[in-house]
């Protein structure tokens, strides 16, 4: 990765990026995380000499993009309105190149149910699941999937609205809570075993990271607030299993159409089998975030990572 980046860096002219809008903040439930990610990206690009315009996305976005004469956009919005294909569609209508995945891949990845359906159709392992829309759905899922289970809003990130449950009563309560965030709620089989997260950058898979947390799972607090989460790089897998994980990640990304950069979450069960959970097309870039951590393990500092993501928008969208 370092040699590939060195080749990129040797030919990189930051002036070629033009006037770059960093789109961050927004109105989703992940706004606070996006504000932190955006601030870090803005600082890195500014320090590198890029002409940056910071735009906290609101109702005046279209006017700002036009009045600021934006040439390119770095999307660091998390969640709905920025990571679900809608922002990508707006930018394409305006003819503004942008970072990350396109409209379809962004929309697919934001929809946990559709992502799982694509993976299942291609034989890519993902935990069994059910859609919850009523108490009777909860009862049926309890019977068909057993316990423990994990409940998820279908279109939220950062583990917002998620809960592990061990009984039908807990499942009903968790469904009702998740439904406050999303009209569509999923429940999945709980996979017992270690969790891994794998970042991808410019078509390459970065070193996998093993996660350890004293929390029930890698939730919002573990991701962004507390400092008791353990990260292991190298991830502790033997070379054969690590390569299997890398190959599975690449296959899963290709299935969704991930471009530029992203991050996948994977569980390994007690039999050593891997299970894909979900994919993130605009991962966090805070001081707790995993993509910068994986990039460091591959030899890239934060500024190099940000420039590599931005440079990919030139390669793919001009």
UniProtKB/Swiss-Prot annotation:
Pathway: Cell wall biogenesis; peptidoglycan biosynthesis
Cofactor note: Binds 2 magnesium or manganese ions per subunit.
Record-listed ATP binding positions: 142-197
Catalysed conversion reaction: 2 D-alanine + ATP = D-alanyl-D-alanine + ADP + phosphate + H(+)
A GO BP entry: regulation of cell shape
Pfam family, one: Dala_Dala_lig_N
Top-level lineage group: Bacteria
Gene: ddlB
Subcellular location: Cytoplasm
Family, as annotated: Belongs to the D-alanine--D-alanine ligase family.
EC number(s) given by UniProt: 6.3.2.4
Function summary: Cell wall formation.
Principal place of residence: cytoplasm
SUPFAM superfamilies xrefs: Glutathione synthetase ATP-binding domain-like, PreATP-grasp domain
Protein's name in the database: D-alanine--D-alanine ligase B
Residues that, per the record, bind Mg(2+) 2: 278, 280
Record's GO cellular component terms: cytosol
Gene Ontology molecular function: any one: metal ion binding
Record-listed Mg(2+) 1 binding positions: 265, 278
UniProt KW keywords: ATP-binding, Cell shape, Cell wall biogenesis/degradation, Cytoplasm, Ligase, Magnesium, Manganese, Metal-binding, Nucleotide-binding, Peptidoglycan synthesis
InterPro entries named among the record's database cross-references: ATP-grasp, ATP_grasp_subdomain_1, D-Ala_lig_Van_CS, D_ala_D_ala, Dala_Dala_lig_C, Dala_Dala_lig_N, PreATP-grasp_dom_sf
PROSITE patterns xref list: ATP_GRASP, DALA_DALA_LIGASE_1, DALA_DALA_LIGASE_2
